[in-house]
A protein has these predicted regions:
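A structural microfeature
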Residues: 58, 147-148, 238, 309
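Hydrophobic adenine-recognition pocket in adenosine-nucleotide-binding enzymes
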Residues: 254-256, 289
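Active-site rim helix/loop that mediates acceptor-substrate recognition in acyltransferases
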Residues: 23-52, 61, 196-231
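Conserved donor-binding loop and adjoining core beta-sheet/short helix segment
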Residues: 36-120, 232, 240-249, 257
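Conserved active-site tyrosine of GNAT-family acetyltransferases
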Residues: 134, 138, 300, 305
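Conserved acetyl-CoA-binding loop-helix of GNAT-fold acetyltransferases
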Residues: 85-104, 256, 262-279, 294-302
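Acyl-donor-binding surface of acyltransferase catalytic domains
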Residues: 1, 88-173, 314
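Short amphipathic alpha-helix that is part of the acyltransferase structural core
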Residues: 1-36, 163-206
């Protein structure tokens, strides 16, 4: 008779010196952990492990974009994939619920969970098993799938089209200048996160302000990089936010006003944003778009962006 598996010990890291313990399981963002801890984007008390003896059988961690901020995102959730089911899933759920109860205030909204996954994860049995095991645990805790996304990369040496002259680009003059354009772009958006903001009861204007204040206001690269696209007569067409986040040069946001969609302006605007970053001598530019946002995905492909990875995001509608 096979003995029942022992109950795991579930606890947070005692300090940054236990990072090696945390890294006994692996994920594609392991190389960022040390710097995240040093800069306050991650804290030992947000980093939890499930242990059987000295064997790590599960781990998770939350992340924040600002030193001293509350947890904004659950971006690490790993299990020992050599374990059989249901043992693997039971450990994962116990780890998730124990850590959540300890880290997040009772009744507060749970931060979104996201994971980077191979682009062919559905065709690769091993990758599919890893992905589906995480999804099952999250669903058991009450989460639902929000969206699957394409992660994209432009690489130095890839040609960027010259400015066609169809549009005139100017710098953003301030918060209101950009928010006033973001709001109409959000109306009718194909972006799942944008749709979720509107479904929560926020107006398009409120959702735009929230996006600006929580993300764009904290970007450390110059606002002089940001561009508003106009027709030669001065009518705004759209905008692009080239920037650098804590890890990579990125196209943080791009949009075309509803009345100007269908004219191919997205190609001109994306090219301008890419040119701004390429002029800084970067070796890559990262971007992402929803799997279902076919027009945006096709625009990135036309400009030579490669789909190197995918991601999925899950959310909890209740605390």
């Amino acid at each position: 008779m096979t003995p029942a598996p022992s109950e795991p010990t579930i606890r947070p890291l005692s300090g940054a010196d236990e990072l090696g313990l945390f890294c006994r399981l692996s994920y594609v963002l392991d190389h960022e952990l040390a710097d995240d801890l040093a800069t306050g984007r991650r804290r030992p008390e947000w980093m939890w492990v499930a242990l059987r003896g000295d064997r790590v059988v599960g781990r998770l961690s939350w992340w924040t974009g600002q030193d001293g901020g509350a947890p904004q995102f659950l971006d690490f959730f790993d299990l020992d994939d050599t374990l059989p089911e249901p043992d693997r899933g039971e450990i994962g759920l116990r780890l998730l619920e124990t850590a959540t109860a300890a880290v997040l205030p009772a009744g507060s909204a749970r931060p979104e969970y996201g994971r980077f996954i191979p682009p062919d994860w559905r065709e690769d049995p091993a990758a599919r098993d890893v992905v589906e095991a995480r999804i099952r645990v999250m669903e058991a805790s009450g989460a639902r799938m929000l969206v699957e996304r394409l992660r994209l990369e432009w690489r130095a040496g890839t040609a960027v089209p010259e400015d066609t002259g169809r549009l005139v680009f100017r710098q953003v003059t301030g918060r209101e200048d950009l928010v006033a354009l973001m709001a109409p772009v959000l109306e009718g958006t194909l972006d799942a996160h944008g749709q979720a903001h509107l479904a929560s009861g926020l107006s398009a204007r409120e959702a735009a302000e929230k996006h600006y204040d929580e993300e764009f206001a904290h970007l450390k690269t110059p606002q002089e990089w940001w561009r508003i696209a106009q027709l030669p007569g001065g009518e705004p067409v759209g905008f692009v936010i080239p920037a650098r986040n804590n890890y990579h040069p990125v196209i943080a946001y791009i949009g075309v006003l509803p009345e100007h969609r269908g004219n191919g302006y997205i190609d001109d605007i994306l090219a301008e944003g890419t040119r701004v970053l390429a002029a800084q001598g970067v070796d890559r530019v990262r971007a992402a778009t929803d799997l279902g946002n076919v027009p945006m995905a096709e625009a990135f492909a036309r400009l030579g962006y490669v789909n190197f990875e995918r991601a999925f995001d899950m959310v909890w509608d209740q605390p």
